[in-house]
Amino acid sequence: MKHVLKNDWGPLLAPEFEKEYYRELDVFLKEEYSTHVVYPKIEDIFNALEYTSYENTKVVILGQDPYHGPNQAHGLSFSVQPGVKTPPSLLNMYKELRDEYGYDIPNNGYLVKWAEQGVLLLNTVLTVRQGEANSHKGKGWEHFTDRVIELLNEREKPVIFILWGRHAQAKKKLITNPNHQIIESVHPSPLSARRGFFGSKPYSKVNTILANMGEGEIDWEIPNL
């Protein structure tokens, strides 16, 4: 599962692929992919980093582990492949977006448009066994994605971290650089969205911060496919 990242993440993360934890993770993943159905496809594991380079990252939306149903996961947190029903948490994200900006809820959950504008859609665990949420938790991915967060924390140019729910908020300890901004609320999951996600206006908060920095704002509207 070693991967040559084709943008500026490549040299930054190359040392991770040589560390003992990643070698053990690599052995585990080869076994998992050869004996079980695992998501996403091998070639999609690092899509978040491929779509959103280090220098171009303006915003990070932190997720947990990939969707574990057929044809859903493709390497971006919260996003699903075209032609797949929009999952409940993402539907709530769209409802909040509609309330903030008046955008219609799209007919898909394909968030590549966000990634291409500098929104790093990063899960803390990058693979999962079909039908078994958190099945690859504690196997090494957390070390790797913590390093991604640490590298962004080291950047002088500000990054806006969106932390929804306790799992994402546990990563706050890695964000120590005062240049960066944190936006947080409960998770958009149907279990918690009404306890403070709805009405939290994360998308317009991001764009206000970007505008104040003289940076281009994110066009959050996802087109129909």
Swiss-Prot record:
Residues of the active site: D65
InterPro entries: UDG_fam1, Ura-DNA_Glyclase_AS, Uracil-DNA_glycosylase-like, Uracil-DNA_glycosylase-like_sf
Pfam families per UniProt: UDG
Catalyzed reaction equations: Hydrolyzes single-stranded DNA or mismatched double-stranded DNA and polynucleotides, releasing free uracil
CDD domains: UDG-F1-like (cd10027)
Name of the gene this protein is made from: ung
Species this chain originates from: Bacillus anthracis
GO terms for MF: uracil DNA N-glycosylase activity
Enzymatic class: hydrolase
Entry superkingdom: Bacteria
Sorted UniProt keywords: Cytoplasm, DNA damage, DNA repair, Hydrolase
Protein name in the entry: Uracil-DNA glycosylase
GO biological process: base-excision repair, AP site formation via deaminated base removal
Gene Ontology CC terms: cytoplasm
KW DNA repair (keyword) present: yes
Record EC number: 3.2.2.27
Higher taxonomy: Bacteria, Bacillati, Bacillota, Bacilli, Bacillales
Chain's role: Excises uracil residues from the DNA which can arise as a result of misincorporation of dUMP residues by DNA polymerase or due to deamination of cytosine.
Family (UniProt): Belongs to the uracil-DNA glycosylase (UDG) superfamily. UNG family.
Localisation per UniProt entry: Cytoplasm
